[in-house]
């Protein structure tokens, strides 16, 4: 029988000092010998996706204690990518993922915790905690803060749905009045929760369902809805059950690495492709797989992207649907159900509920079940009231959306496209691959050939776009923004948004060794690997070079003679593969991150060969 990890600090006379300190935290005599469960919270007033989490940790803790465990809460940091966007703050976003993973490991191992509940929500917090969970491999349940309600406003006598990206695009659109821009800004983000589209935060919270590490509805039930409270309560109960099964019954099938195995990672990636999720999820799944010691690579992603259709289109890929609509259509269990019926899912994987994925789909897929409680849960909808309070409303749709022909979620037969929502491209410009969200690319530019216009930083690219330097037909190349070159691999949401603001959204392509926000759409190709700072060919591109992009054939090519490229490479070798005339202060902390960072095809994790 596995011994409780916490026994190291709670048993024996030699641990009298540790027990004295445990008592000072509130533990009683009969608590020693119970599993000590870390409640890993991420509350902060900086982030709307986390502003409502202050009391969630204790909500979970009380359930843990009712079920027979001892709960101890601590907090991690949380960066708001939207607020950090467009300035030097974005350099810190991706590095914070690894810092979160390390901080969770430090706290859990230092205090010998037996299990944990991870309360996450936004872009780097869920993947950071996921990396920690798979690294530690102790019983764990994920529960997130939930999505924000979509914004709504009336413009030109028409009610329109909004999100953060609309505020950014229209704020830079010279054809939009100051009054309309201000109205959109005030209406775009009405409640607490992770931004309302299928951006990175919501994508990752959805993927935890496919990985089997969170409960059904975790990715889609609104932050404001009363139904979400039950997810927190159930997480507290379930983690104690997992502890009993592992520590008392010697059942290691409940551990994160047993649940999130190779098949589960393939399920998560298939879900991501089917729902047109954020390209950042590729980065995070690759990183998490390495923590789990799962052999999951860009080659697997390429293979899956050629098999899985696009079954759901949500903002930013359309303004018709947001996360509240995904929930009404049955949430992630519904998309997984459609993938299962198309024989595109490993349904024998396990979940934290102790079920196989097939059993969980049968119970929670609204197309399969007649259970009124399940249908009621997925009818949970928005209230349209500005608030920062969780569980503050109980509004419901009259019906669920089970239309698999024309609804938010579709069957394979009626898919938005038989080609999936994400694709990996390769060629001389990206020998180790690059990623594009095909769900956000207009059909007219799936094949695109244009002249390169090169920028050595995101800031210069923004100035070039807004200043009129970028013209229709250009391939905007933004380099030295990768994990090493940034350092920190900034998101390029402002450049892609400003291309739309300037009317160039369907007339230009953008290629970068940086990454994109989940809010990005258009012909935006990121994660170019190897990155410029690692000697990638993107570092050799010059203004006017012809670049050919062919998404259907998964190809990206720089049309320059090999002899010329060899000469350019020799010049860069002398220069040390550094950006030219870039004005950027880089802190010591970021330099450390950049020194150890691998390229995006490896998940931008630390290079262990350098340690």
Curated annotation (Swiss-Prot):
Domain of life, per UniProt, equals Bacteria
Q: Which GO terms describe its molecular function?
A: 2 iron, 2 sulfur cluster binding; dihydroxy-acid dehydratase activity; magnesium ion binding
Locate the residues binding Mg(2+). 81, 123-124, 491
**A Gene Ontology biological process term:** L-valine biosynthetic process
Enzyme superclass (EC): lyase
Q: Which UniProt keywords apply?
A: 2Fe-2S, Amino-acid biosynthesis, Branched-chain amino acid biosynthesis, Iron, Iron-sulfur, Lyase, Magnesium, Metal-binding
Q: In which pathway does it act?
A: Amino-acid biosynthesis; L-isoleucine biosynthesis; L-isoleucine from 2-oxobutanoate: step 3/4; Amino-acid biosynthesis; L-valine biosynthesis; L-valine from pyruvate: step 3/4
- One cellular component (GO) term of this entry: cytosol
Q: What is its EC number?
A: 4.2.1.9
Q: Which residues form the active site?
A: 517
Q: Which residues carry this modification: N6-carboxylysine?
A: 124
Catalytic activity entry:
(2R)-2,3-dihydroxy-3-methylbutanoate = 3-methyl-2-oxobutanoate + H2O; (2R,3R)-2,3-dihydroxy-3-methylpentanoate = (S)-3-methyl-2-oxopentanoate + H2O
Q: Where does [2Fe-2S] cluster bind?
A: 122, 195
Query: Cofactor stoichiometry and binding?
Result: Binds 1 [2Fe-2S] cluster per subunit. This cluster acts as a Lewis acid cofactor.
Cofactors: [2Fe-2S] cluster; Mg(2+)
- Asked if the keyword Cytoplasm belongs to this entry, the reply reads no
Q: Does the keyword Signal apply?
A: no
Query: Which protein family is it in?
Result: Belongs to the IlvD/Edd family.
Query: Quaternary structure?
Result: Homodimer.
Q: What does this protein do?
A: Functions in the biosynthesis of branched-chain amino acids. Catalyzes the dehydration of (2R,3R)-2,3-dihydroxy-3-methylpentanoate (2,3-dihydroxy-3-methylvalerate) into 2-oxo-3-methylpentanoate (2-oxo-3-methylvalerate) and of (2R)-2,3-dihydroxy-3-methylbutanoate (2,3-dihydroxyisovalerate) into 2-oxo-3-methylbutanoate (2-oxoisovalerate), the penultimate precursor to L-isoleucine and L-valine, respectively.
The record ties this protein, via PANTHER family, to:
D-XYLONATE DEHYDRATASE, D-XYLONATE DEHYDRATASE YAGF-RELATED
Q: What is this protein called?
A: Dihydroxy-acid dehydratase
Gene name tied to this protein: ilvD
């Amino acid at each position: 029988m596995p011994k409780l990890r916490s026994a190291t600090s709670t048993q024996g006379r030699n641990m009298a000092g540790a027990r004295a300190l445990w008592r000072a935290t509130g533990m009683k005599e009969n608590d020693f010998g119970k599993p000590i469960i870390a409640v890993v919270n991420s509350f902060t007033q900086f982030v709307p996706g986390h502003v409502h989490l202050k009391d969630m940790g204790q909500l979970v803790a009380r359930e843990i204690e009712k079920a027979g465990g001892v709960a101890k809460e601590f907090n991690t940091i949380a960066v708001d990518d939207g607020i950090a966007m467009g300035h030097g703050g974005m350099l810190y976003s991706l590095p914070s993922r690894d810092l979160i993973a390390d901080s969770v490991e430090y706290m859990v191992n230092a205090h010998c915790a037996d299990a944990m509940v991870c309360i996450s929500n936004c872009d780097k917090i869920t993947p950071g905690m996921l990396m920690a969970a798979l690294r530690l491999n102790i019983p764990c349940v994920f529960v997130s803060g939930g999505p924000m309600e979509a914004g709504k406003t009336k413009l030109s006598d028409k009610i329109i749905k909004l999100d953060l990206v609309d505020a950014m695009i229209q704020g830079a659109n010279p054809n939009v009045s100051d009054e309309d821009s201000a109205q959109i800004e005030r209406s775009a983000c009405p409640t607490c929760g992770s931004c309302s589209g299928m951006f990175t935060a919501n994508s990752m919270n959805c993927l935890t369902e496919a990985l089997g590490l969170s409960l059904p509805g975790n990715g889609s039930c609104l932050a404001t809805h009363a139904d979400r409270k039950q997810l927190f309560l159930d997480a507290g109960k379930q983690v104690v059950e997992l502890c009993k099964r592992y520590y008392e019954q010697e059942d290691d099938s409940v551990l994160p690495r047993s649940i999130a195995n190779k098949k589960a990672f393939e399920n998560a990636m298939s879900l991501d492709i089917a729902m047109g999720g954020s390209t950042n999820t590729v980065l995070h799944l690759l990183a998490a797989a390495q923590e789990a010691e799962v052999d999951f690579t860009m080659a697997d992603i390429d293979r899956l992207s050629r098999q899985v259709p696009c079954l759901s289109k949500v903002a930013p890929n359309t303004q018709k649907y947001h996360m509240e609509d995904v929930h009404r259509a049955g949430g992630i269990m519904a998309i997984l159900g459609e993938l299962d019926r198309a024989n595109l899912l490993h349904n024998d994987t396990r979940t934290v509920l102790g079920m196989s994925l097939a059993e969980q789909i049968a119970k929670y897929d609204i197309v399969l079940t007649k259970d009124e409680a399940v249908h009621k849960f997925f009818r949970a909808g928005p209230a349209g009231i500005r608030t920062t309070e969780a569980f503050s409303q109980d509004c419901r749709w009259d019906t669920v959306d089970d239309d698999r022909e024309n609804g938010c979620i579709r069957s394979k037969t009626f898919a938005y496209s038989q080609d999936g929502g994400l694709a990996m491209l390769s060629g001389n410009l990206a020998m180790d691959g690059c990623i594009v969200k095909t769900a956000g690319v207009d059909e007219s530019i799936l094949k695109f050939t244009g002249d390169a216009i090169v920028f050595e930083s995101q800031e210069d690219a923004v100035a070039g776009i807004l200043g009129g330097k970028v013209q229709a037909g250009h391939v905007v190349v933004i380099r030295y923004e990768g994990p090493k070159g940034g350092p920190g691999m900034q998101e390029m949401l402002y450049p892609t948004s400003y291309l739309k603001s300037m009317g160039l959204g369907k007339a230009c392509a953008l290629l970068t060794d940086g990454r994109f926000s989940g809010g990005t759409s258009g012909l935006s190709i990121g994660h170019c690997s190897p990155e410029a700072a690692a000697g990638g060919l993107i570092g050799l591109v010059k203004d006017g070079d012809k670049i050919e992009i062919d998404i259907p054939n998964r190809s990206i090519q720089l049309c320059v003679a090999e002899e010329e490229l060899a000469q350019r490479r020799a010049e860069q070798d002398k220069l040390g593969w550094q950006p030219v005339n870039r004005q950027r202060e880089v802190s010591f902390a970021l330099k450390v991150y950049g020194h150890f960072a691998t390229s995006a095809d490896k998940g931008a994790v630390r290079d262990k060969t350098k340690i």
